[in-house]
Amino acid sequence: MSIGQKQGLVEVADGIHVWLPADGSWGWSNAGLIADNDQTMIVDTLFDLPLTKIMLGEMGRVIPTVKEHVDILLNTHANGDHCHGNELVPTSRIISSVATADEMSELPPAALAAMVRRFEEDDSPLGRYIKHAFGGFNFLDITMKTPTETFTKNMSVTIGDLEIELIEVGPAHTKGDVLVYVPSRGVIFTGDILFIEGTPLMWAGPVDNWIAACDRIASLEAVTVPGHGPITGSSGAIAVRDYWVMLKNEAKIRFDDGMSVRDAVRDIDLGAFADWGESERIYLNVNSLYREFGSSEVVEDVMELFAEMGEIWEGEHENEKYF
């Protein structure tokens, strides 16, 4: 189930709004605003400052106090499309898991800006894929504002009369993924544990942590806000779980048969999951699974992984032109 393809700031429960971009592909992430009794919490910021500024303007229109003060900013994980806008949020309290805080330093915004510049005139499959994935964002002049407070496993915070549960389920997508659950409103923000109508990608793993997180989300039967894509419910979590169960099983069969990552990727039939956006992420995912299985021949270089995904993407979009 997904709740339409709305965009902008959407109210999903009393005092809870979700920021939804036009689509949930590379870098186009969701965020949230939780408000009660003049207190506010923002869940994640966006990939660049202009986008975050627009989002905060809309949030301030609905909850005017956001313009001057936000009680808590929570980053669900360390990917830049969920934290690059932190500096624009008027708050002194930024919370994440310990692992997320540590991971934020691994790919600074300046490195992304340099990567985009490097491939501006590159007409190779890798260059075209980098422009497709990241060319629509402005990574200049971002100063990373990192967490002031960290936790492991679980933490509870209060916004007004709302008790909010912060639940660490990583490592999975990244090293420190966190869910944000508001029991009294029946709403959960999943970060990138859920991609809806798009293919998830596993930077960290293990996959069993991700599967367990999906089971946990589904069991809550809450209004479910994914990191990317439309708002969903338990069925969305089950679909992502089923993707990982399928891919783990199919990859293990081919690993046991001695196939390389590249050959396994081209041999696996995604079935219904082939219709999900960014299906080329199968390469990164199988590579991560092979690492779990103990392969010594996995790709560790991120640019090489993007080159492999770009080659698959080119084959699927050979008649399209980007940027």
Question: Language model features by range: what are they?
Answer:
Residues 15, 34, 44, 59, ...:
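Divalent metal-coordination and catalytic microenvironments
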Residues 11, 109-168, 184, 214:
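Metallo-beta-lactamase
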Residues 153-217:
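Ligand/cofactor pocket segment of small-molecule handling proteins
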Residues 257-323:
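C-terminal regulatory/interaction regions
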Residues 43-45, 69-77, 95-97, 169, ...:
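Active-site neighborhood of phospho(di)ester-bond hydrolases with catalytic His/Asp-centered motifs
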Residues 10-61, 178-191:
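Conserved beta-strand hairpin/beta-sheet module of binuclear metal-dependent hydrolase folds
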Residues 38-40, 50-96, 220:
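Active-site metal-binding motif and surrounding structural segment of the metallo-beta-lactamase
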Residues 181, 187, 209-271:
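Divalent-metal (often Zn2+) His-rich catalytic cores of metallo-beta-lactamase-fold enzymes
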